[in-house]
Amino acid sequence: MEVILLSKIKKLGDSGAIVHVKSGYARNFLIPKGKAILASKKNIESFEAQRVELEKENISKLLIAQSRAEKIKTIKSITIPSKVGKEGKIFGSIGIRNIIKEMNLLGIKVNKKEIKLPNGVLRQVGEHKVIFQPHNEVCEYFIVNIISKK
């Protein structure tokens, strides 16, 4: 099934590209999520007229994401105190919600989807690398330092 991508999709194509995908992927994911439209003659003509507006919108989203990533760069690390048992293991785990809570205290608003934990939830005391990805093309790393709560 031929579709026109309305936004950049990793490993598929850029905005405005006409790509061939499986019909189930198009009908069940791309089209309902507003990431693509069917590539009929009528849609291709109307999309060409809207292309400039969509490109401006994508550029503005990218600039906003880059400015948010610059804020993250200034922080570099976040410290989260936690109860610790023997051998440096914490009771429970530190997840995305805990990290977002600490970032909100620092005055930085982030969504749950923008934080990625490469090794899963954090269960050890020490420094852990976390990924902040507000946009497909923008990626920034920061450190979460888990310390013992006394």
Swiss-Prot record:
UniProt keyword list: Ribonucleoprotein, Ribosomal protein, RNA-binding, rRNA-binding
Its job: Binds to the 23S rRNA.
GO molecular function annotation: rRNA binding; structural constituent of ribosome
Similarity comment: family membership: Belongs to the bacterial ribosomal protein bL9 family.
Biological processes, Gene Ontology terms: translation
GO cellular component terms, A-Z: ribonucleoprotein complex; ribosome
Disulphide connectivity of cysteines: none
Protein's name according to its UniProt entry: Large ribosomal subunit protein bL9
Highest taxon in the source lineage: Bacteria
